[in-house]
Amino acid sequence: MTQTLSQLENSGAFIERHIGPDAAQQQEMLNAVGAQSLNALTGQIVPKDIQLATPPQVGAPATEYAALAELKAIASRNKRFTSYIGMGYTAVQLPPVILRNMLENPGWYTAYTPYQPEVSQGRLEALLNFQQVTLDLTGLDMASASLLDEATAAAEAMAMAKRVSKLKNANRFFVASDVHPQTLDVVRTRAETFGFEVIVDDAQKVLDHQDVFGVLLQQVGTTGEIHDYTALISELKSRKIVVSVAADIMALVLLTAPGKQGADIVFGSAQRFGVPMGYGGPHAAFFAAKDEYKRSMPGRIIGVSKDAAGNTALRMAMQTREQHIRREKANSNICTSQVLLANIASLYAVYHGPIGLKRIANRIHRLTDILAAGLQQKGLKLRHAHYFDTLCVEVADKAGVLARAEAAEINLRSDILNAVGITLDETTTRENVMQLFSVLLGDNHGLDIDTLDKDVAHDSRSIQPAMLRDDEILTHPVFNRYHSETEMMRYMHSLERKDLALNQAMIPLGSCTMKLNAAAEMIPITWPEFAELHPFCPPEQAEGYQQMIAQLADWLVKLTGYDAVCMQPNSGAQGEYAGLLAIRHYHESRNEGHRDICLIPASAHGTNPASAHMAGMQVVVVACDKNGNIDLADLRAKAEQAGDNLSCIMVTYPSTHGVYEETIREVCEVVHQFGGQVYLDGANMNAQVGITSPGFIGADVSHLNLHKTFCIPHGGGGPGMGPIGVKAHLAPFVPGHSVVQIEGMLTRQGAVSAAPFGSASILPISWMYIRMMGAEGLKKASQVAILNANYIASRLQDAFPVLYTGRDGRVAHECILDIRPLKEETGISELDIAKRLIDYGFHAPTMSFPVAGTLMVEPTESESKVELDRFIDAMLAIRAEIDQVKAGVWPLEDNPLVNAPHIQSELVAEWAHPYSREVAVFPAGVADKYWPTVKRLDDVYGDRNLFCSCVPISEYQ
């Protein structure tokens, strides 16, 4: 039969590109699990009362090329003015070698958080470099591997200051009046739930205030003034007050390290080390503290350890501080950080080295000096005598100056009384400075750059002598070796080769949704129209962003069944926090602020109780029954016991146990009956889209992991996005912003992120995914994710029992394999299986979550039957190896599992094992062999011998 033109146009072509199994493979798998069709399978699994009768109306699919053209037209509505607004955001020059070999390289951006260090040594080394940059520039002893943004880091610094403070009765946190306004906004939001009083005043008046446990100072103030706080910090320390300092990473190249001045905590944004502004993000924050406070620090910390052969190896250290272990007692709810962006910043430092960074910083400062000298020569007054890159210029005709700036397509900072702010950066040129002279002085200013340069070169007093750095930075060889592009390219490739990412194999991590991050989805993030906008530019310059964000929000509203979506949260954990704050403020608006009990099932992700604690709630755990479902009797009892103090329940759906609970609507009804709200964690949204929705189920608020369900890549541990969907009654209580009015959001609440739309520049990824899939493709993606999980479960259940199943013995989009009986019988653990999978070329499934002694597998819809079978065959082969141990063929203390993973050097070393080299390193054959570079990590050694900075190059050889 002749095809129609519509069929030939094939607007749904991308659906087949995104979904791994083709129609024939899908039918084979359906036959294997005993289902006639995808609809029949989901009809068996998903409770009838929550199945959508009609699909969400998000439109028909578009081809990759049509979607890119459509988004390009939207992006073209953004106006790319030259921005001198500053406030913590500047234009950058991202070295092309890093752009091409990291940011645009799936070997870097599709990797997961390095919980399995043996397959993560490359990005762990890059993160260790980031920590070394932080240590050198801040002058402190311990650094983390990034936080979500500078403002979040400030809030974490406040919380940490309280944890370590010896002034246990003090409850006030002092913030210097010249911190960035968005920083103050986020600090105030966090302080409210902790019950802290925030005092804002001139830094020199801090000693006038009593009962202060911590102080936040900014080394280079928001309007540009460099502060020498040495004496003040000394006085504060004598009073046992914890001192945090916000610092500019580029200024720190030239300025005295705050740690050397006595600061306890130093943080800031690493954005200007090569990361585009992107209308607010994503950007990595750096965070450092004194060694004595290391166990109270938030976020991931990379440490140096040893592997089983005694070789140097890297790992995430001190994980007992974190939410996935300590739950509500964790230092922070942080799960996702900003690994990809931290690694861009670290490689920027590697590529430029100390000499290059000093040249960049000195050039920025020289141009600022030239601008200042010219303006002063013509009679304009600078508000501050000491500055690095930012001038606060007093102007009589401010309106006229701003009008001339707009005509020249220039953005100046305009919110300063009787003055304008001008922040220069590494992209600023001589021509830009001359243009600024014209804007501020008129065209006939008569100034000459070279003449001014000679003047300031011999007589620059804009940085106080005491504030000039007198120590060397970045002396480690890694920062002094890779300065040619050839060397840099090879170094980055050597790191990439050490890691296992989606460009090599499936990553079957349960609760993580490691699906395809399609090239077409990634292309727009580097378009200048999206990458180069300042988050605080006038809204009329960001009409393309506003249109794209509004469309994406509308689609998410339809897909979730909610009434509004807030795009601000920078991660899933931050979305949880924002959603719980909305619930808290809603109760307060009804004079029910006493409602502070949050019910959380025993199976919940660790971020849930940690976020509830951060939102000022008490956590009460609800039991699960023998089938892994919420125990309704216990829920009713706990809700009744909480009574008028019940705030909410946090529940994941499908459950963290990998099943669609039949009673989910009843759970919602019980909580609502007692006046509580239902927070439905969106971590497993990939099994809902197009089939059901949180709003239809009965929830009030959810966060959406755009880095899971909606295809933003995990980046090796960030970036992520966690927007929240809410019912209408909660919409007035979502985060707002003190600098930018968020259109369509009538909220009066404080911010949770530095930028109004969080990591706005990665939102085009999710826009592209939804646009190319359409309603039809999105539903099919969910259905195939469910099919793939059930196929794996059905083929593996005889070898590894599936712990929890729902109706008809089915699972949702993931399954939990119970290793405990095998461990009791043979001594082989889930850890041994996880490490042995590396020899077979796979990243391990999620270990011991949500149940200790298990492996949780989530294949996603993007993996083909060929890849699923390869994984299944590997698991079955491992089961056969376990049987060899059980039969006594291999001793428990010396077999391929307990010695896994095996590395290349073992092939030429002496061999005393009872199994062959071939069994050790080529269990799945030689084709596409992945070689780990280290053997199994010694976690105990790493935590007992904590070392979190760069080691000699010889240690890696």
Swiss-Prot record:
Short name of one Pfam family: GcvP2_C
Entry EC number(s): 1.4.4.2
Disulfide feature: none
InterPro entries, per database record: GcvP, GDC-P_C, GDC-P_N, GDC_P, PyrdxlP-dep_Trfase, PyrdxlP-dep_Trfase_major, PyrdxlP-dep_Trfase_small
Classification lineage: Bacteria, Pseudomonadati, Pseudomonadota, Gammaproteobacteria, Enterobacterales
GO biological process, one term: glycine decarboxylation via glycine cleavage system
Protein name: Glycine dehydrogenase (decarboxylating)
Domain of life: Bacteria
Family: Belongs to the GcvP family.
Catalyzed reactions per annotation: N(6)-[(R)-lipoyl]-L-lysyl-[glycine-cleavage complex H protein] + glycine + H(+) = N(6)-[(R)-S(8)-aminomethyldihydrolipoyl]-L-lysyl-[glycine-cleavage complex H protein] + CO2
Cellular component, GO annotation: cytosol; glycine cleavage complex
Function field: The glycine cleavage system catalyzes the degradation of glycine. The P protein binds the alpha-amino group of glycine through its pyridoxal phosphate cofactor; CO(2) is released and the remaining methylamine moiety is then transferred to the lipoamide cofactor of the H protein.
MF (Gene Ontology): glycine binding; glycine dehydrogenase (decarboxylating) activity; pyridoxal phosphate binding
Keyword Cell membrane in annotation: no
Protein encoded by which gene: gcvP
Organism: Shigella dysenteriae serotype 1 (strain Sd197)
Record PTM N6-(pyridoxal phosphate)lysine, positions in chain: K708
SUPFAM superfamilies: PLP-dependent transferases
